[in-house]
Swiss-Prot record:
Keyword Ubl conjugation applies: yes
Name of the molecule in the record: Cullin-4
Functional pathway: Protein modification; protein ubiquitination
Lineage: Eukaryota, Amoebozoa, Evosea, Eumycetozoa, Dictyostelia
Originating organism: Dictyostelium discoideum
SMART domains reported in the protein's UniProt record: CULLIN, Cullin_Nedd8
Amino acid sequence: MNFNNNNNNNNNNNNNNNLNNNNNNVNNINNNNKKPLTNSLAGTPPAKKILVIKNLKQIPKTPDNYEDSSWNKLSSAITSINMKQATTLTQEELYKMVENLCFDKILASNLYNKISVQIEKHITLTIKHLVLTMSSDPIIFLKSINSIWKDHTNQMIMIRSIFLYLDRTYVIQNSNTVKSIWDLGLFYFGNNLSQQSNLERKTIDSLLYSIRCEREGDEIDRDLIHSLVKMLSSLNIYTKFEIEFIKETNRFYDMEGNSKINEIETPMYLKYVCERLNQEGERLMRYLEQSTKKQLMAVLDRQLIERHVDVILEKGFNAMVNGDRLEDLGKLYQLLNSVGEIKKIKESWQSYIKQTGIQMLNDKEKEATLIQDLLDYKDRLDRILSQSFSKNELLTYALKESFEYFINTKQNKPAELVARFIDSKLKVGGKRMSEEELETVLNKSLILFRYIQGKDVFEAFYKQDLSKRLLLDKSTSIDAEKSMISKLKTECGTTFTAKLEEMFKDIELSNDIMNSFRDSPMTQNFKSIEMNIYVLTSGNWPIQPPIEATLPKEFLEYQEVFNKFYLSKHNGKTLKWQNALSYCVLKANFIQGKKELSVSLFQTIILYLFNDVIDGGELSFRDIQANTGLAIPELKKNLLSLCSSKSDILIQKKSSTSSNTSSNTSSNTSSSASGSASGGASGGATKTKVIDETDTFLFNSKFSSKLFKIKVNSIQIQETVEENQKTNENIISDRQYQVDAAIVRIMKTRKTLAHNLLISELVSLLKFQPKPVDLKKRIEILIEKEYLCRDPENAMIYNYMA
């Protein structure tokens, strides 16, 4: 062949030389005849040129016996390869034979057919030998067939390299009817595998057996499995294996999943599922085709997750949330999210939040710490939402909705307790916090505030507590107070905080008034008394009715002078003194030294009486009541505070006729007062005492304390039962006005409206959650007042009356 190619090349070179010579001749003619062409020459057609290739030689004819001779050598080479022996001729020599035969299409076709027969014959004999020597042990069998497959592929690689020219010419030219040498080997191998004693079935079953052993914890030869799976894929029978593999996987995890879900706890089951998912993922990567992934994972999802979702959540969800098991909850979320069951988590999430929250609200023993407990509860849920549930939007909304639901199952109490909680943080006497810590607590409190529907209840109690903090100088920081007001304004608008802001303005204005008053000549006679007076706008403050009391002469004179001063500058205004919110700092002489006592005005009045009593002298309850003018319940509360074990400024003495049990009034009073007796100078637990009207009292001159400034337990800063009741009554009254105004406003616009529609609009309009029965009562009252009337034809329709 090379000889022929060289001849062609030489001929081509000669042709090129001839052409070049011709070109040179043409150039010479042109150079010699530079005259312009005449008309006769221009009209004569040019002579035809003939291309002549000199020294052209034909391909020599192959000898008659060349085909048989070449095939014998090629066949012998194939046999040597199949026998794992060296060939007598080099690969290059064998390749040349194939190349020479392929120049003739008939010889090429004959060559292809002979190769096909020899390949088929060898594979058939090999597979038959495998059947005769086949082991019943699946692993040994797999090793045997893998060895044959490896030999086959190695042999076919060598055979293909010899007959590569045949592949590139004859096979490509007849690709619709013949296979490549490599595909020919695969075809015969696959056919024999299927036809010989169901060898294909045994191969698939043995592979499934090995995979099952691995799933049960045994070690297997993964390279062996990978090789055989690749064999099935190459032979186009992987799909058959895949079908059986999925069936086997389904059976395996059906049984194992049912067993595990009943045997182990939910966290362990979730761990088991994750491990199985990882194992199957690794199995896919190591020896399975990626086309199997979707079906395989669908089986695991169905058998290990979807079928057991309800059991998983019922058995373990609450326990995992209670135990703050973030990692396990994260696994739960990932697994259920992968099968589209987030809604099931949402249902369990909502149920847990509501049930736990309602239990917390109903635990009366922990009412004092309820708000802090709720904040801790919310923090825990937020942590789960963030770290375990990836801040899923559906679960985030479910948390908000559930928290709002349970916190409003008790309409007024949570709102009151949130206000009380904020009061405890802004009031002197609580745990000291940095500005950052206080800001954090206030922000968290606002989260609960947002959930509360009865914001008017919060407003009422917050205003009550704020008034005491401002008037009794119990606020830790005015800046913190104003910051809280600003937060409330952002949440609810200016209307909500208008009166709260006015309270601060009253305090600031009062300071200016007092500075002016102290500089006036009217106070020259009162230099021994340092008094601070707050002038409050009655509409802005939660002012209770004044409590009657007989004040010392100095106090009355000071009040009278201030009255004249203020009214002289504010003509037409009147002042009403709120003595119940006043407090004093007294200097008291005891045997062990002087002390400063911080007490309420009413306690001051009581202590003043003992200035006129000789040492060791006593005053009866009735004497004190007559001289102070205080009502009996009020007097009992203040005496109890002065006699408590934390202060012991006064010593209580029981008469022989005193009852061991108190009346209802005394019991309520003592309970309230004993609860307020905190923060005094002396240590020890507060003893619950009862003040009887037959008791006598004497000044404790032996009182001792390491502190110079003594804060006598005062009931002023605490909300009394009466004040609490009054606040709730005011809330109810305000709500009635709001409902009436809303009804009139709606009906004035609509003129005519059905009962259900009116109720619906009221619920959406009001800031609190009213009961339908209460709304119905207000409608009836407005009908009586002739703001509304029933439609003559339908009693469930209301008409507005101008």
